[in-house]
Amino acid sequence: MLVALLWFVCFFNYADRQAIFSVFPLLKAEMGLTDIQLGIVGAAFMWVYAAIGPIAGMVGDRVQRKTLIVGGLIFWSLITICTALSTNYLQLVLFRALEGFGEAFYFPASMSMISAYHTSETRSRAMSAHQSSVYAGTIAGGTFAGVLGQHYGWRSGFYVFGGLGVLLGLVLLAVLKEPAREVVAERGKSSIRGLFDNPMVAVLIAVFAGANFVAMIFLTWLPTFLFTKFHMSLSLSGFSSTAYLQVASVLGVLTGGVLADKLSRKYKGGRMMTQAIGLFCGVPFIFLTGWTLSVPVLILAMAGFGYFKGLYDANIFASLHDVVRPEHRATAVGVMNSIGYLGGGIAPVAIAAAAGRYGMSASISANSLVYLGVAVLMVLGTRRYMGGKIVVP
């Protein structure tokens, strides 16, 4: 029941943040924005999200998680509505930044709440089921914002998603329950310092930063890339840039949850092994997405990347919770999100700048090297710090 309720919150968490990317061409035409300015609109969310992450995590280890989840949902939904009222570039940047502030409190609190209900034997499956809402929300945000934007103007999607989010928040006030904490954090103790007792935490966070850099490029620029390179309509580019990749990610995340739970019963680094497989196998599909001139090959590439991205995504937080103490779980997620979205926050602007010199196709394909690098780092870290030792005969 808990995972089902949080699934819908996470759905709007991603639908609201994704919607703006599908209407970049409309914003560019109406407000006369450059690609760099559009990149900053996308990055403003991530910069604030990253800055607030550690604070949100520490608050999540000390304050009622239900309050943070429901309060955050209502706040960012209202900001989504306000985004529709923007009439200039500065207002867009401001509201995107405020949305990043509100959404930053969700994942630390929700992941801590799920871990309180699920032991290590079922944690990957529970979190992978929750993670599927990320892809559903991304598809919905990208697709419906594009369709509504094409027919009713770019503002319409923000009114719809924001209004529905507020209604969901009011429902959750009555039905969402706060679970007991496993361990009460000591007041005055530095949770952030305690996180890094296990060096594998730093490895997981570094890998997440690189993987998130690549993911943010796809989320931010793929709709515009399809609109310009393949001459798709606004609604079709919004759909195609999310649906193939994200549906495949749902399959990947469900596979990754089951596989990781099985491997983790035998090996200390079982979840990390699953993530490494996803990272390595995703490399050629990233390259193909940027390089191909064929729409069928493009669809195959996006779906292939999405599936193997799902293997990695299924265990982002489950792997982290394997190597941190229960009283530090929300803080760990906050710090991981913070550093990961610093990487993600650079991506929209960096790719806009690179595309101006090398072209968007080459810039997207080059990110296959980033994925390869973090895949190698994951393998080396797992072998060194987790040992690959059998823990269950």
Residue positions per predicted region:
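Residue-level signature of mid-helix packing/kink "hotspots" within the transmembrane helices
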Residues: Q18, M46-P54, T138-I139, Q246-L254, ...
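Extracytoplasmic gate region of multi-pass secondary transporters
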Residues: I20-F21, P199-L254, D313, F317
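Helix-breaking motifs and short loop linkers at transmembrane-helix boundaries and internal kinks
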Residues: G32, Q64, L85-Q91, T119, ...
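Conserved MFS/SLC helix-loop-helix module at the cytosolic interface between two early adjacent transmembrane helices
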Residues: A51-T87
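Structural signature of the two symmetry-related core transmembrane helices
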Residues: T67-I81, R271-I286
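Cytoplasmic helix-loop-helix junction between adjacent transmembrane helices
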Residues: F95-A136
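Helix-loop-helix hairpin linking two adjacent transmembrane segments in secondary transporters
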Residues: H130-A174
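Juxtamembrane intracellular "pre-TM" segments in multi-pass secondary transporters
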Residues: E178-I205, K229
